[in-house]
Amino acid sequence: MTYSIRIADLPLTERPRERLLSLGAQSLSNAELLAILLATGQGKGKLSAVGLGQHILKELSQHKRDPLDVLRDMSPQELMNIPGIGPAKATTILAAIELGKRAFQLRPMEKVEINDPVSAVAALSHDLMWQNQERFAIVLLNVKNQIIGTKLISIGTATETLVHPREIFREVLKQGATKLIIGHNHPSGNVAPSQEDIDLTEQLLKAATFLNFPLLDHLILGNGNHQSLRTVTDLWIRYPQEG
């Protein structure tokens, strides 16, 4: 398949819209999903919609980051610098990205029970998942592990955030919570815990044990990924928490 073949000239089984209808959106490549948003290519004899989608991804791959990660942060003007992308195409792409963010970041209703890292990630996503600066937030729980609320504690730089145990447990007391989950984001999308993350978690587990407010997990979020320190460290074995 070449970039200049029109979608209308493709067999039905190879057209992005038809493939989405028959196989589901998850079966399409990134270029095919972009092609559906673009609707048209660059015109006769030039790139088709799929070809233009491939060209966009190729251009963005020069940033040494995942092309979709780059695309997520682009402004309309930056998108329109790519040949073949005008205001209509740029705004359609960015509207789709924003809608996806909002769907992913929906807050759970209060009193939802947190029983695994995934449900806690859903509670923290609005504040942490797609942010360009490091942020630290907490999920406040009652005795039944139901959400009382979430609270953004601090906002740092692109690479670090500063938080003190006093700020965290003050909020726990203020909201009448009995347990908590803490979380922060890595804007890079690499959710592997750093030594600083591990050290902070140990410090907070000691404080939680002393104050009798069980700390159930420390989650790292970023660009659609997440990691639970409870599952990848032995800290909760060394500092057992009720609940």
Swiss-Prot record:
Keyword S-adenosyl-L-methionine: yes or no?
no
Q: Domain (MPN): give its ranges.
A: 112-235
CDD domains in the record: MPN_DUF2466
InterPro entries attached to this UniProt entry: MPN, RadC_JAB, RuvA_2-like, UPF0758, UPF0758_CS, UPF0758_N
Quick one: which residues bind Zn(2+)? 184, 186, 197
Organism of origin is Gloeothece citriformis (strain PCC 7424)
User: What GO terms in the biological process aspect are recorded for it?
Assistant: proteolysis
Record carries keyword Hydrolase: yes
A single Gene Ontology MF term assigned here is: metallopeptidase activity
Give the protein name, as stated in the record: UPF0758 protein PCC7424_2073
Q: Which UniProt keywords apply?
A: Hydrolase, Metal-binding, Metalloprotease, Protease, Zinc
- State the family it belongs to: Belongs to the UPF0758 family.
